[in-house]
Amino acid sequence: MGSNISKLWAARIATTLAVGLSVLAGTVQGQSFPSKQITIVVPTAAGGANDAMARLVAQGLSQRLGQPVIVENKAGANGAIASEYVAQAAPDGHVILFGYIATHAINPALQKLRYDPVADFEPIGLVAASPTLLVVNNSVKAKNMQELVALMKAKPGSFSYASAGNGTAPHFAAELLKLSTGVDMLHVPYKGSAPAIMDTIGGTTQLMLPSLFTAYPQVKGGKLRALGLVGDKRSAVMPDVPTLAEQGIKNVSMSQWYGLFAPAKTPKAVVDRLNKELNATLAEKNVVKKIEEQGADVETSSPDQMKSLVQRELTRWRGVVAAAKIKAD
């Protein structure tokens, strides 16, 4: 009897010590982090919108963490190459991903990948969000969404929309619009946003649903017209453009969000430190201004809030894939 009690107490003490040592180890790791250069892996090519935002974040983190923070571009496979690379990196916070809706919701909803967007990552925090913007070629006569829907219904199949490729955010947004309104339009996929935008400007396609981040320069320059924001609220960047919901089109909302992710099993203390310095960087007025100038709104979050966002978005877009019968290439 006494021997059993002694063994029970010994087991409890050992468990308590193990938990205590684990917490202590995490705290020590957090205090010593970073011990070397940090790399932010960007899943798109250099010179694009994601790249510009990541470099802005890298500069702020470097100043606050006291170590170089560089950007490494690993474009391809709609973000899967970069995501898989970071998922397999050492879980110490020195290699992190500038992820976005494609890497952690749309691409995984569309097809089975060699990484899990939830299980293989520790969310650090949101960086920004850019609502989807419905833009049309200047020759399209519609001045608002009701007129556009009426035109498309009057001539089914006569309108075509451009996307950055099959399974990309603009493709998903357009299919969501089709499901909600019942319009019939042809999908013309391109290899990237740039040629899709240019052909919409030129009139090869009549409309597109890119992020405001992507379309803002063309709308500002008068090359495209914005008919509505595919988001829950108006944007501070383009406050005069109404949402689709304001124009009577419900259940069509898509915000293209961006954030940082660490590999799974990165210590909580390290993730929390990165989240703290990321949010401090995003609170700087010059950073907010530069992000807004490119057509996005600064958004911050805790790691847990971002994890919940990823889970919600993944569930939602899997439903859209099934309803619209979207297939991967």
Question: What are the residue ranges of the model-derived segments?
Answer:
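Bacterial N-terminal signal peptides
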Residues: 12-25
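A ligand-binding cleft/hinge motif common to bilobed small-molecule-binding domains
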Residues: 103-112, 171, 176-180, 207-241
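N-terminal (or domain-start) structured segment
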Residues: 30-120, 158-160, 166, 182-211, ...
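Extracytoplasmic/secreted proteins, especially bacterial periplasmic and envelope-associated proteins
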Residues: 52, 56, 60, 81, ...
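An extracytoplasmic/periplasmic, membrane-proximal ligand-sensing/linker region
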Residues: 2, 35-37, 180-181, 220, ...
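N-terminal secretory signal peptides that target proteins for export/translocation
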Residues: 1-9
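Hinge/capping helix and adjacent helix->loop/strand transition within the periplasmic-binding protein
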Residues: 88-94, 101, 108-195, 244, ...
